[in-house]
Curated annotation (Swiss-Prot):
Pfam families: UPF0102 (PF02021). PANTHER family: UPF0102 PROTEIN YRAN. It comes from the Bacteria. This is UPF0102 protein APL_1363. CDD domains: PoNe_Nuclease.
Amino acid sequence: MVQWKTLTKRSQGANFEQKAREFLERNGLKFIAANQQFKCGELDLIMRQGDTFVFVEVRQRKSNRFGSAVESIDYRKQQKWLDAANMWLFTRHKQSLDTANCRFDVVAFEGNDPPLWIPNFLG
């Protein structure tokens, strides 16, 4: 069950990122890193599935009154996500999105529903 207590935005985000990490690990992904920040953007979770780097965006909404958690990932956010992933790949592995095997997944939490996992969100 999702806890919607009065937490700061940052601690609430960390709580959902931890829940997403545990969910993905139960589904066979291996944890690499969390909260990787660059000037161009941030990566919530970096996981690995086989030889594929998985860059995970974690989103949460108490309700979908103002749009769903998934709908909140607009074009600008997608570009920042891609830029941050490219930066991480270069600084850690001297690779790029063009050379590395990677994908972009979303784990969304809405109300008390179970997490919604969307593999390969950016297709």
